[in-house]
Amino acid sequence: MKEGVGSTQNRDRIAMAVTALVLFGAQWFIGDFPLWFFAAPMNLLLGVLWLVALWEGYRHRERLSAVRYLLSAEATYVALAVATVVAVVLGLQSEPASTSWPVVGGLLFVQSVLTLVILRGWRNERGVRWRFLVTHIGLWLAVTSALFGAPDKEILRVQVGENPTREAISEQGEKRFLDYELRLEKFDIKRSESGSPQQFCASVAVDKRVVTIEVNSPYSPRYGEEIYLVNYAAEGCVLQIVREPWRGVTATGVVMMLLGAVVLFLQGFSSEKR
């Protein structure tokens, strides 16, 4: 029996290694993962189907060695390592890395392990484990928004001049029309004592509201959308609009993780007092 278990575990490890090689090979030979294809509603549909598949896999885990492996301590350690590496990579180069096959595959693995862990541990003989749920669901929301929310992130560029415009260009070169008008009021270049440019500042009318946009100091017309100053030319300035509709999900996950950490600290403090 032990040999059978060991053989199954080795087979699962080999499958993981082969999957990792396939992901890196896809990145090398195919290029970036086509996130645009999985934009809403495709990502929502696939996300629901994947959760249903994980739930069914958990229900029949006694017959599925792959699910049992994902529920093992080894898979948890691997998921923690993968999550750490992905976080570092995304922190260093968010835009190019988020579309790579290894990062997408790594996030899917972490999300799968986390989902199964939540299904197994959300309650015990004493009832619902609320602290466990708050912390783990918070992490689950953060990982899920990074995985399934990435296709919905949109980056647009707008050439803004004296005449109002609603037309923007996507990263794929497609036209997009904004639900607000943009018009350049004025552009200032603040220089240092030596005469070199020190700060770039654009006054832009967003519909009827005039706002100031500086380099690395964007304006947010609504939650999850920011307008950045990118460049300036004789015909006007170039603005970049970044839309992240899943930002609220990410923020909720982070708040839940912090809340879980606070509850853990308070419980530990009260235990020490007793």
Listing of model-derived features with the role each one plays in the protein:
Residues M1-R274:
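Solvent-exposed, non-transmembrane regions of integral membrane proteins
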